[in-house]
Amino acid sequence: MEVSIINVNSDKIGTIDLNPLIFSVDYRPDILKMVVNWQLSKRRAGTHKAKTIGDISGTTAKPYRQKHTGRARQGSLRSPQFRGGAVIFGPVVRNHAYSLNKKVRKLGLKVALSLKNSCNKLLILDSIDVNFVKTTQVLQFIRNFEHKSFLIIDKDYNKNVVCSCRNLHNVTLLKQIGTNVLDILRHDCIILTVGAVKYLEERLL
C-alpha cells in the first residue's frame, strides 16, 4: 500500500509502502472496545473509600437499654441507620487494572490505525524537527487539513517541537513508544513520521 510522504509545508516529497497487515486490517469494534476499556481501567486511581463501622470514631457503648424504652433496639451509634454512621457495601481502595492478552492489544492498535487509514485521516510526515520555536508554523501546517484534532507520533521530539505545539489545544504530541488505541481514537487525524511507521511495523509484526 503506497502512501504519500509530506513535509512541514504540506508538500509531497515522496511515497512510502505501508504494510497491509498493520494499516489495512478489517474493522473490529469488539476488539477496540476491549482495548479501550482495558486502558481506562488501568487509568483509574482506585482511591475511592467509604468508612465502614470499624473506621468511624466514636463510642462503642450501647446507646440505651435493650427494653422498656418504646424505641427500636440499637447496639451502636455508628450503625448505618444513624446520621454519621457507617456505609454498607461502600467503595474500598482497590486496583481496577486487569490483564489483557498481548495479541489482543496488538490487534487493537492495528485496527485503530487501519480505521484512520481507511477514512483518509492518516498522514505520513518526513520529520518534525525544527530549529526554533514557532507556533505559527505548526498552526499553518494543520490548517491545510480539514480535521478537528491532530495526534503527532514521532520517534522522539525536541524541545522546540514541544514548545511550538503546547499552546494548541487540538494538537497532541506522543512518542512512538506510547502509541495507544485510546489516543488514536480520540483524535480526528493521526500524523506519523517515517521513523514512527518503521517502529510500529517492527513492534506489531
Curated annotation (Swiss-Prot):
Any single GO BP term: translation
Signal peptide (residue range): none
Keyword field contains Endoplasmic reticulum: no
UniProt GO cellular component terms: ribonucleoprotein complex; ribosome
Pfam families in alphabetical order: Ribosomal_L4
Keyword Ribosomal protein: yes
Top-level lineage group: Bacteria
Start and end residues of each stretch annotated as Disordered: 56-78
Record keywords, A-Z: Ribonucleoprotein, Ribosomal protein, RNA-binding, rRNA-binding
GO MF annotations, alphabetized: rRNA binding; structural constituent of ribosome
Subunit and interaction comment: Part of the 50S ribosomal subunit.
Family: Belongs to the universal ribosomal protein uL4 family.
Function according to Swiss-Prot or TrEMBL: One of the primary rRNA binding proteins, this protein initially binds near the 5'-end of the 23S rRNA. It is important during the early stages of 50S assembly. It makes multiple contacts with different domains of the 23S rRNA in the assembled 50S subunit and ribosome. Forms part of the polypeptide exit tunnel.
Protein name according to UniProt: Large ribosomal subunit protein uL4
Encoding gene per record: rplD
